[in-house]
Amino acid sequence: TLADERPNIVVVLCDDLGYGDLACYGNKTIRTPNLDKLAAGGSRFTDFYSASPVCSPSRVGLLTGRTPNRAGVYDWIPPGRAVHLRRGEFTIPSMLKRAGYATCMAGKWHCNGKFNQPDQPQPGDFGFDHWFATQNNAAPSHRDPRNFVRSGKEVGAVKGFSCQIVARETIGWIERHVASSADTPFFSYVAFHEPHEPIDSPEEMVDGYPDAKKRGEALYYANVENMDAAVGEIMGALDRLGIAENTLFIFTS
């Protein structure tokens, strides 16, 4: 059973998703079939508290298990600010790496102001073997972002929507890991930008919400649905690779 092994671990963190935005938590409008399936087959938490109501400190709290202020971050971090997750803090990936896990991070970092600069620690300094990230939000929007950095190297413009880009980076890393080191467990931190603004969504999904009172609502609904589809891609890859039953999959916001 899962308890007898060192399971793989996938943690998916959304940005600004409300607890009432998923069908499995009572939403009657937004289609989230993959997350509904995950909730139906697992444990659905009804009492959960973030370490902070804003972005950067909540991420620091998740990664360290500490009150964010104690780890050096007390508010969201604007670009260029001399604030960052303190070097030397113990994190989930750093401790799992010590335990023999391979580690990957893909998506929104937002734990420092001077992203991909040598005078502040970067994702790799906190235990991630491979990282593919932005400092803050996908820019100029979720569509065709151009601010990703892969393990210290700028990627440039990437076609597609951020959540699919992040999901496919994650899947590609997992596939390579399983092919080369199948006996080594892995930890994958998937930090979607969705549905934080600036929002953009596939038009075919936007058109699927004709009863929305305004286009902005339809864009948001479609954004959550598109994120759900990206979760489905990751879940499908775990099934295809035959490792789903030995993978602890956690979704939160």
Predicted regions and their residues:
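Formylglycine-dependent sulfatase
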Residues: 1-253
